[in-house]
Each structure stands twice: as C-alpha cells, then as structure tokens.
C-alpha cells in the first residue's frame, strides 16, 4: 500500500478497500495490469485531484485533514484515520451534519466521533436545509455528551468560517486538525492562507511572463466544441462532480 498514495501508506483503510475494489473492477473490464498499477500510483488525495476527499495540508506547524464527509460512515472512517496517524499533540475536529438528516442521524455522526478527539467544534452548514440556525450544532453537542465526551471539550460555533478559524488558531505544533467542510473551495483557501501567530508572511516573487501561446489547432478546437455540445444540459459543482439535469418522464 505504500505505492498507493491515496491510502496514506495503508493508514486510510477505507481507501485500501476502495483501491482493491477499483482494481478488481478495472481488471474485470479487461484493463491491463500495468495501466491499473499506473492509475493507483499516480492518483492521490490532493485538493486538485479529489477536492474534499481526505485532503492533507501539512505546511502549518500542525497537520490538517480536510474532508466532505457528511454521514456517519464517512465520519467514522475519517475518525479511524485520525487515530492511525502519528500525532504528538492533540486531535481537534470541526464536526458538522447536513440539516435535512433525521435527528438520530445527526446524533449518530456525533456518536461515531466521540472519544476519538481531544476537542470538538460543532458547526452547521451555510444552508441549514430547513433547520433553525443552532439546531445542528446543538444536536451534535448532545450526541457527544450522551456518548461521554466532557462538556469542556465541546464548542458550538455555528458559522463554518468562524469554526474553522477557531480550530486553526487552536492548533499547536504536533496537533492534528480534522475539518469536515461544506463550502469546499472557500474552506480550503481559508486553511492554506491561514498564518499562525508569529509566522512571517512569505514573499511572493514576481512571475516570469511566458511566451505567447501558438495559435490553436483547428482539430483541437473542433474536439473542444464537440465536448461542449455533449456536456450541454449538465451541471458541475465545485467538487468537479458532473450531474445531468433532471428531466420529466
């Protein structure tokens, strides 16, 4: 598994399972083993390849795990990963749940995270999906306390940006921050642009202007136009996922 970056050297057991499943499916479709190996070795969980899917940022004094997990199974998998990573400091989590889930589903998200972290910050999404502004954080906090987490280890910060900022400012060298995010691009930028107190701002060198690009190949333009026609009527979200618009039967 050390040759499969998406498994984080085998610590991300759910991605070990995903890699095995993907390899088996590809092989059953007749894809050559060399191509399967190449795919597994070159795919990683950077924000650019898989936004919101176990992204790691370790350029702060602490490590940040960033994920879009929004159900109990996803939260449990990431909490398990947080336990498997080598952490010399504290484990801090920014926890959330979609507002259109049942109360018991939201409480279950809290339950599977309970006992895995030193500090919990409970928040809501920008879109509360019909719930009151503080309802989701309150249910999460309730689930944590019912599972035995001390009240002193639980914070309720409703706003996503404020919750993430609080976690970042709380982070110390050796800590691990697990951030469950909803507004992916905004939250990722917030994490990578954060500057801990006392950290000098990096100077930005003046970019070197590149040579003008040659005129586009007519065949390439034709292929691009054909692709745009095929994609007409679809919707792409900020994660890069493409959906077909719903049509009446």
Language-model regions: role of each:
Residues 5-6:
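Flexible glycine/proline-enriched surface loops and loop-helix/loop-strand junctions
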Residues 9-14, 21-34, 38-249:
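ATP-dependent carboxylate-amine ligase
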């Amino acid at each position: 598994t050390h040759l499969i970056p998406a498994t984080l050297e085998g610590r991300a057991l759910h991605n070990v399972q995903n890699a095995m499943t993907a390899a088996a499916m590809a092989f059953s479709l007749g894809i050559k083993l060399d191509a399967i190996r190449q795919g597994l070795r070159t795919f990683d969980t950077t924000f650019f390849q898989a936004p919101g899917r176990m992204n790691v940022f370790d350029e702060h004094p602490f490590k940040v795990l960033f994920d879009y997990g929004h159900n109990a199974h996803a939260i449990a998998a990431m909490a398990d990963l947080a336990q498997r990573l080598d952490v010399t400091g504290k484990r801090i989590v920014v926890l959330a749940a979609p507002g259109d889930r049942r109360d018991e589903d939201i409480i279950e998200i809290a339950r599977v995270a309970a006992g895995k972290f030193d500090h919990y910050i409970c928040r809501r999404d920008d879109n509360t999906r019909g719930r009151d502004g503080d309802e989701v954080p309150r249910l999460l906090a309730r689930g944590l306390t019912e599972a035995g987490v001390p009240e002193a280890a639980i914070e309720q910060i409703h706003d996503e940006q404020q919750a993430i900022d609080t976690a970042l400012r709380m982070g110390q060298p050796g800590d691990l921050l697990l951030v469950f995010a909803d507004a992916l691009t905004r939250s990722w930028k917030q994490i990578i642009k954060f500057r801990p107190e006392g950290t000098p701002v990096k100077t930005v060198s003046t970019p070197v202007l590149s040579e003008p690009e040659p005129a586009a190949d007519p065949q390439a333009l034709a292929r691009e136009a054909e692709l745009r026609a095929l994609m007409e009527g679809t919707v792409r979200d900020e994660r890069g996922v493409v959906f077909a618009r719903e049509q009446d039967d």
